[in-house]
Amino acid sequence: MIQAEYGVVRSEKRTAAEIKVATECPINFNEEVKKIISVNAVAFITSAENKGEKTLVRAKVAFRAVYLTEDGFKKCEAFAEAEAELPIVGAIVCAEAVDVRMSSVNDGFAARCGVRFTGESFKTDENQVLTGGEGLIIKPCEVIADEVTETASEEFTVADEFEVNYAVKEVLCHSEFIRVKSVESGVSRAIFEGDAEITVKALPFSENNDIIKEKRAVPFRFELPVIGALPDMLALGEVRLCKEAVKVFTDEAKNKSSISVELTLAATGCGVNRIKTQAAIDAYSRTDEVMLTRNQPAIEIFEGTRYRDERITAKTNAAAPDGARILGTLGEAVTVFSVNSSDGKTTINGSVKADVIFRNADNGTTCVQAETPFSLDITEEGKVCNVKVALCDLTARVRGGDIEFEF
């Protein structure tokens, strides 16, 4: 008589979700506006909580506008809120402001954008497998699957202060890019290493209104407590920006300024354990008839996260005004249109755009919106998922009368 023995193979199925919502708020300028130069927006996640089989994500959106008055460039800021319910639980979530625009409303202005909420989580699938038994002769095989720990999240702070050799009249805008270089698993922790790349667009005390760009990279290392994580595991995680504070202290007598930046970041991650289970790929008996039900479960194996930098120089769709020179760029943004995978190659198509500010030959100011497409190829074995593209830096120049981007 056959007495079969069974085991269970647990595997993690990655699930992803994306929801885009709209938000807007009025922009109140304190003085007469000659021209709107640029508007952009940043979305900060304020909370993420499980609600049944969903994750409720809330975000604050900061709209930032640069405009021109009789006294030169000025800036203003306004805030809105957005929320969405992602149809997944325990998600690693992100929020991004897209399609930012300004429009006239009655006697004023309103800023609008879409907020794209994305998240990914893991759902455990269980499959029963034959492992042996009395009266059975089996052909063994090894089933490899992943098990993930619980997802953890915690905030930490990154700060920097630097001096510039000119007197700053005003910081027109600033942006922060969180570059994660590695996520490793340790004893009950996930270890994140990377840089917080800070870009400040400053307006000095001068008559030419040049916009000066300052860039700083602040390294960070953060150990996130993760229950069940061990050094022989892989780790999966993200770091996002939660809060930002930029302050300027100017000494006009010395013609110097000090710029301080404090960022609150949130690390979210988990450990990924590779489990090997012995199972039977075939079985028979010398004494009894054996009937097998064969099943090939779809098991995804996490091989790690890849990070890659790409430098592109491309002509845009815009021309430079005759006799004008570039003062700077504002409102830089990247948009991904499609991600397609085939035969081990993943192609990412998108575009980069920016507001290019010119000083005209008659000493006036012109803002030209320029955009250029891009295409990137990634070659990796296996399935590529959760592709993200960030714009780290952009320089505009005039070549042959056209605006060219290097990014």
Regions found by a protein language model. Give the residues of each.
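Viral structural modules
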Residues: 1-407
